[in-house]
């Protein structure tokens, strides 16, 4: 798992392209080997190299995104999209509830909850992700000089969150 991410980041750096990542899974399997734990550090270092090269790193959370994935590289994105209702967590709800000794809201650890607390920039249906990502990258990379407010409004009903996320 970690090797694939590191390879993808290196490919983005070598080709000077953005890195768009779709994390999905229960996390790095720490109990299987120390390699998984080491990969948390290695993937984080790879993302730092991407940032040193001033390349955008977009994360699109899918269901579920949990464990070591959220404890390392998934939360380091420049922009975070999430699918509606997806689980975004480090530890399970019961573990946290037992630790804090209080009842947690029913939407705890959902993309909506995480967005409300500032860790997700925008919730987007999967079918709309291509358009949203393309638009955002054209803004971030300033490559498409034809992008103007009229075109943006035709592409997206509500561009304010994208413009805010891009600034």
What are these regions (language model features)?
Residues 27-141:
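Conserved catalytic cores of soluble enzyme domains
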Residues 2-3, 37:
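Short, conserved loop/turn and helix-capping segments at secondary-structure boundaries
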Residues 3-29:
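A structural preference for short, pocket-lining loop segments at secondary-structure junctions
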């Amino acid at each position: 798992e970690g090797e694939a991410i590191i390879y993808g980041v290196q490919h983005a750096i070598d080709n000077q392209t953005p890195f768009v990542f779709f994390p999905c899974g229960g996390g790095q399997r720490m109990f299987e080997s120390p390699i998984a734990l080491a990969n948390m550090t290695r993937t984080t270092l790879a993302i730092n190299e991407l940032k040193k090269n001033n390349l955008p790193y977009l994360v699109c959370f899918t269901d579920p995104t949990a464990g070591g994935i959220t404890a390392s590289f998934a939360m380091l994105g420049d922009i975070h999209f999430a699918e509606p209702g997806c689980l975004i967590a480090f530890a399970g709800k019961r573990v946290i509830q037992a630790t804090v000794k209080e009842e947690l809201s029913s939407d705890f650890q959902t993309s909506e909850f995480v967005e409300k607390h500032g860790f997700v920039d925008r919730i987007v249906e999967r079918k709309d992700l291509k358009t949203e990502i393309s638009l955002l990258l054209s803004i971030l990379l300033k490559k498409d000089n034809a992008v103007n407010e009229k075109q943006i409004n035709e592409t997206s009903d509500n561009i304010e969150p994208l413009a805010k996320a891009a600034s």
